[in-house]
């Protein structure tokens, strides 16, 4: 829809979140709520702007990382507070202008499209609320919107109305430009309300209609409890879509999946699995209580109780319980248990014994460990990086490897065992006959 502009209002302080962090940067399913609504906005137009004030630079930086083309506007909260005041400095360029909120991350592009396609000069979203407290009441007369009355300014009769303002609007641009300068702040909060556009539009004979929407999709987030409710809704949607696409989940209610994660082929997620960040998982099994972060997993089985940290690429590999991989590239490897494999590259056919550690950090910098094909690493081995282990190598159990190992070699680095006969009885002052 190249003829449509979208303005997202995100200038509020979000005091009910009780945090120094801006409200719109709180995450749902791994991504800030402002990013969720931006994704939906860009699904229908390339003309998108965000109105900011509190922590403008911080929010703008996060937005620009993902959507650099986004227009950033600043609201003058001192002189023009309120939702209409937010549009004071915004550039309105499309034939239609959709105005929505940055704290409604469950809104879908299809919802915005319905507003844009409405046969009206102004279309506003509304729903029948089970509990309308806190919402602006929508006064509908003859199928048209007569007025919107904010909770703070509503009479007893108006408070009984359950049809409420969901917070999104679509205006014909020329009408919005005509009406905005006419809005006054003559209300208890001394704010410029966007809802007043309805009253003014009706006075001027413009057509204002209500578009009924889902209360769930238009849920606003004002505190951390509402954040948790919205995240559960989004999690359920993500998991339902994935299961319908062929991903098998054991106890799906216990699983967390980031909204950026992608799955391909037949995958299994067991209970209490967390898939964090932009993971790509293909034809793999992730066993119970495992955590995968920003990594690529293909043709592998991971866990249980494994931790795959960011920038890992694991292919055709078995990762067992209590194994941690960080920034590791593993192809055709077996690492069964109790190992740390950080900043490493391990080739096919290699077996990593229990208790193996890549010692990748010297207190100042991280170093890489490279392990070739068909290497057998005995239990309780320390590989002190930087170090290269060639193909076809055996590392003896209990070794600390500090130098490169050539192909075909046995590397052993440990003290020679010595057995002192009778030492137990001497040490504890016991006679051998007393046993």
Swiss-Prot record:
Residues at which Mg(2+) binds: 103, 222
GO molecular function term, any single one: glucosamine-1-phosphate N-acetyltransferase activity
Gene Ontology biological process terms in this record: cell morphogenesis; cell wall organization; lipid A biosynthetic process; peptidoglycan biosynthetic process; regulation of cell shape; UDP-N-acetylglucosamine biosynthetic process
Gene Ontology CC: cytoplasm; membrane
Cofactor binding: number and manner: Binds 1 Mg(2+) ion per subunit.
Region feature Pyrophosphorylase, mapped onto this chain: 1-224
Residues at the catalytic site: 337
Assembly: Homotrimer.
Protein name per the record: Bifunctional protein GlmU
Classification of source organism: Bacteria, Pseudomonadati, Campylobacterota, Epsilonproteobacteria, Campylobacterales
